[in-house]
Amino acid sequence: MTTRFDAITLEVLWTRIISVTDEAAKAIVRTSFSTLSNEANDFACVLTDARGYALAQNSGSIPSFIGTLPATVRHFLREFGEDGLKPGDVLITNDPWQGTGHMSDVSLVKPIFHRERLVAFSATTSHMPDIGGRVRAIEARELFEEGIHIPLSRIIRDGQRDETLIRLIRANVRTPDQTMGDIWAQVSANELMENRVRRLMEEYHLYSLEGLADELFGRSERAMREAIAAVPDGTYRYGFQTDGFEKSYTFKIALTIKGDEIVADFTGTSPAQPRAINCVYAYTYAMTAYAVRCALLPGLPNNEGMYRPVKVEAPEGCLLNPRFPAAVVSRAQTGHYVPVLVLGALHKVIPDKVMAGAGSPLWAVAQTGTRDDGRPYTNVLFFNGGMGATSGKDGEHVLSWPSNISSTPVEVAERNSPLFFHYKRLRAGSGGAGRHRGGLGQDILVESGSTRPIVLSFMAERTKFPAPGFKGGGAGGLGDVRINGRKVDHRRQHVLARGDRVLVSTPGGGGYGPARARAAALRLRDRLLGYIGGKGG
C-alpha cells in the first residue's frame, strides 16, 4: 500500500531528512582529524532509500557526491544483497569505479533497519589525508601507484570492527592516526543519521521510506522535466583544448534536448591517458547532471528524481570514461571541465542562465615531509580561481566551482606544516574583460621553514588555455607556478629546501558580453579597488 502525503507533511519530512544530513556533516567537522574535512569541506553525507536512491545530501556539500555516493550504495547492494546486510554493519570502499572516482576518497555505507526491516542507507565519503602510494602524483601511470585499494568490504560486521582490515589500512598510509581518525568520524556520522532516521520513522509512524521517496522523486523529476522542456529542442555543441602534458587534450560535447530529456554526448574527447587525470564515468555523470541543475533548476534540493531526465554518453576508453586500471587520483583536473562544457553548449540557447568559464579546475598543492621529531606528515592545500561572469553579474573572486571546496585558512595551514605564508591576495587584471567582468584569481606566496626537504605535488590547470568568455567577453588570466622566481613545470614533483619560495597564481574567470558595453561606474569601481592591471579586467 502506497502512503500518500499532503504538501505540508511532505515539506516537513523532506526538510527533516535534509537536516539529518546537515547534522551529520557538523559531526564530521567537529570530530575529524584532518583539515581536509574540518576546514576544506571535502566530504559529503547522503541518505538513500532501501534501493540506494538519493533522498538528500548535506547542504553546502561537494556536488559530485550526490551522483557518486548513491551509486556506491547500489554497488554494495549488488555485492552483498539485502539478505547479506545486518544491523551494525558498516561497509567501506575507495574503489574509483564504484566510489567517487579516486582512491583518496573513502566511502562508508551503513544499512539502516527499522522494526527488523531494511529501510535506508546512511552514506558518507571523505578525502583522506593520505591513502599511501605516490603523493598525489599526477605523473602516476596506473591505479596501483596511487595507494591502497579497498574493494567493497565491511569495516564493521554486526557491530564488531574488522581489526585485520584496520591494521592493513594503518600499515599502508603515512598518517595512520589522522586517516583512521577521519574514518571513525565518518562512522559516527553514519550512526547519527541512522538514529535520526529511526526516530523520524517512529514519530510519523512510517513502516517504510519508499512511499515518501517516490513522492519526492516524482515531484522533483516532474520539475526537472518541465525545466528541460522549456528549452528549445536541438543539439548544441561546444568544445575546447586544455593544458595536457606533452600535448593538449580535446574536450567535446553534443548536448541534445528532445522534449523533456537531455542527453550529453562526449564523443570526440581525447582518449584516456597514462597520467593520473582520467575521470571515471560516475564522476562525469555527476558533474554533467550538476551543471544541468545549475542552469535549469538551481533552487531545488538534491535527490534522485532531479537526475532521471539527464542521460550521459561517454565512449569507453576516453578521458571521461577510462578503463581499469587507469590512474585517476587527480580526476578533478578533467572532471571539473565537464560543467564548463555543459554550460558552454547551453549558452547558445539560454545565454541568460549560464556563466562564462571559471578559473577551475580546482588547484591544490600536496606536500609531504618529515617533522623534526622524525614523524612523517602529509598536507593538502586547496586554492581557487575566479568565477565566470553572467549576463547580469560580475564573476565572484576566488571561489571554488564546481567543487565547492574551501581554502584552508592560513593560520591552520601554518600550524600543520612548516610553511610560512608571505601573502595571499587578489590578482589584479586576472578577470576576463566584458560587460560583466570575470572574477579574479589570487596570488599565494609561501616559504619553506623546514630544515628537512618538503616534496610538493601540484594540481593546476589553465596555465596554457584560459577560461573562456561568453557573448564577446574576454578570457580570464592564465595561472602560473613559480619557485624562487622561476616558472616551473607544475606537472612534476618538486623538492623544497629551507628558504625556498613558491608563488602560486590561480587563473581568473571569463567575462560576459563585450567590454565596451561595461558601465562607466563599474569601470571606475574596478580601478578604485585595484581590480584592473595587466591583462583582463
Spans of features found by a protein language model:
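Glycine/proline-enriched, intrinsically flexible loops and inter-domain linkers
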Residues: 1-87, 92-114, 118-263, 267-537
